[in-house]
């Protein structure tokens, strides 16, 4: 695409907003912030990319990101894959039962859902319960060994928020609010995002 963070920044400094506004490179950037950390001036290029994405008409933004954002808005679970509250709970129970049956050392393993007063509220990326449910149990084991007081919630468990990557502030806020309100209703003190834990 002939673009990189340095060129992007140069276009912004030169006031060539028209060349930035519609350039597809902003959708190739992962907003990982490495360029910001490498920048000797500490310029937040990721924030600039976010604002450049925001200039695109919503219906012209990448369909995969747009679809995932809209899916999370359509269900109270917050899942970008559309996994319902009941399906999420079923997957947890199924994996928990399998672990207890096949791994006797883990017969006491717990994966609480909607546990009132738990200290930690744990969100979950939809990919695991949807495609790789066996990837959920290792974290449960770590939390069990550490004696952590935690819970999932049926409402707002979806930890991925594609609305942020879409640069859709209102939708981002709505998905986030759903999750945080769920954590608050349960009386949890700390929100843990699954992607940050492991």
Predicted regions and their residues:
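A broadly conserved sequence feature marking short terminus-proximal activation segments
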Residues: 1-8
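Iron-sulfur-cluster electron-transfer modules
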Residues: 9-194
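Conserved small/polar residues in nucleotide/adenosyl-binding loops
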Residues: 197
